[in-house]
Amino acid sequence: MSITFGELVGNFILVTGSVIVLLLLIKKFAWGAIESILQTRSQQISRDIDQAEQSRLSAQQLETKSQANLDASRSQASKIISDAKEIGQLQGDKLVAEATDEAKRLKEKALTDIEQSKSDAISAVKTEMSDLTVLLAEKIMGANLDKTAQSQLIDSYLDDLGEA
């Protein structure tokens, strides 16, 4: 099967003519609809791109706002913790100061009680000594002394004991 040059040119002209006729028919009947579909699709793609850009900007703003809120929350939490530590330190210092004051008060009371006990003991010893001195003096003198003489004797004896 061999094709001649004339047949080849004829087929070429026929196919080319058919394509041209087909393009003319498409342009006349379908090109408006195809162009309309392509333009509608182009507009839809543009709207989708614009919406995507707006969504991205909105998400970026929301992220910035959320980050600012998070930073503010962290700052507040840090301040609350700092304030709690400071209050705890102040309360601890107050408790230590109160305990120190209470210890000083108890120490002073104990010293006062000791001084009072010492004074009471010395007074009791003096009384006992005076009674013993009177008894001893009565035995030595063989007679009872009147109250004035007893008092003078006791005072002089105690003064001698105090100096010794």
Swiss-Prot record:
Membrane topology: Single-pass membrane protein
Domain of life: Bacteria
UniProt similarity note: Belongs to the ATPase B chain family.
Subunit-structure text: F-type ATPases have 2 components, F(1) - the catalytic core - and F(0) - the membrane proton channel. F(1) has five subunits: alpha(3), beta(3), gamma(1), delta(1), epsilon(1). F(0) has three main subunits: a(1), b(2) and c(10-14). The alpha and beta chains form an alternating ring which encloses part of the gamma chain. F(1) is attached to F(0) by a central stalk formed by the gamma and epsilon chains, while a peripheral stalk is formed by the delta and b chains.
Upper taxonomic lineage: Bacteria, Bacillati, Bacillota, Bacilli, Lactobacillales
GO cellular component: plasma membrane; proton-transporting ATP synthase complex
The entry's keywords: ATP synthesis, Cell membrane, CF(0), Hydrogen ion transport, Ion transport, Membrane, Transmembrane, Transmembrane helix, Transport
Record's function text: F(1)F(0) ATP synthase produces ATP from ADP in the presence of a proton or sodium gradient. F-type ATPases consist of two structural domains, F(1) containing the extramembraneous catalytic core and F(0) containing the membrane proton channel, linked together by a central stalk and a peripheral stalk. During catalysis, ATP synthesis in the catalytic domain of F(1) is coupled via a rotary mechanism of the central stalk subunits to proton translocation. Component of the F(0) channel, it forms part of the peripheral stalk, linking F(1) to F(0).
Pfam families listed in its UniProt record: ATP-synt_B (PF00430)
Protein name: ATP synthase subunit b
NCBIfam families, per the entry: ATP_synt_b
Alphabetized InterPro entries for the sequence: ATP_synth_B-like_membr_sf, ATP_synth_b/b'su_bac/chlpt, ATP_synth_F0_bsu_bac, ATP_synthase_B_chain
Single annotated GO MF: proton-transporting ATPase activity, rotational mechanism
Residue intervals passing through the bilayer: 6-26
Subcellular location: Cell membrane
Keyword Signal: no
Keyword Transmembrane among record annotations: yes
